[in-house]
């Protein structure tokens, strides 16, 4: 039995399995198959699978007369790119937008409408570079972020996010194409000392005081960030970057695409999340879940600890090298309170800290002292975490910190019992495969 002899339901199932390209070929066989291959329900499946759209929209977001026509318009608009790469980039942005919609709509509102092929051509001509295919596509879908907004929260809405330690604040935005051009032509070449690398362009930067930028090598497709002495560090494993200028096949992946995909994965899995401080929300790059975040509970006191590599103040050419990390400590008292010898206390207060600092599994320092950053947090049962950040340098790429906090039940002014130690489980401070 041939396809023409199959029932409508069987034919629909078969066509949905063979995909849009083969369905278009089947439509050329006979009038009956052409009718079946043009059904809206069929092309709605193709649009959903390939483009994640549930209504017929063209690439500009405008309504199309049918799902089939919408699919055709998408294919025509992106005909100069491998289709599998188009679908992958679309999925990358869809995942990021979906997360932002649910968790950080203020940042989603800063995403700009994608650029045109003419915009990309003008950009490449002006800077005399050839963008990797995945990066071109990323900008076809989204032209970075608006860097100004009426709410005055510009420094906190970066898509990549950031961290803080003492007075060192970072919040990284994905730059729109016009800012990539301006930063590359003006600030970057004049101020940052990389002018010999003419294939480098500025793709992302922190808009707050700290100097942190991300640079794309348009020839190799690798993404870099700089250290305090202008050394370039790859932000993505080199082995993963390939075929960045190949218009054929489906193996193209540059560091920008890999970087944003990994960032989206961390957001979606809850590895990193939005933090609100002083009524200002931002994406915090401090990991929130194991194994990159340690979690321990002692006598009702929970302590979470994690770190972020700080390349912009590191100096890897020092002897010994200085790998700098920010670390975040979050402590809270569980709803049942502090439990000592069977007695529940509704509060406890920090008195003392003890750190054991290791590099390459060897103890390099023991730190003992009162308070943390000059504070003695009073924890109340069931209330929000007390959070503090600090930073430290290591002579190697692999370090860790563990130790303990000494608390007093009740408060320091009105103790309700003897001091007790709260364990801080070891957390890593290591040079990561992906640098954000």
UniProtKB/Swiss-Prot annotation:
InterPro entries: ApaG_domain, ApaG_sf, F-box-like_dom_sf, Knr4/Smi1-like_sf. It comes from the Eukaryota. Keywords: Ubl conjugation pathway. Residues 295-436 form the ApaG domain. GO terms for cellular component: SCF ubiquitin ligase complex. PANTHER family: F-BOX PROTEIN SKIP16. Part of a SCF (ASK-cullin-F-box) protein ligase complex. Interacts with SKP1A/ASK1, SKP1B/ASK2, ASK4, ASK11 and ASK13. This is F-box protein SKIP16. It comes from Arabidopsis thaliana (Mouse-ear cress).
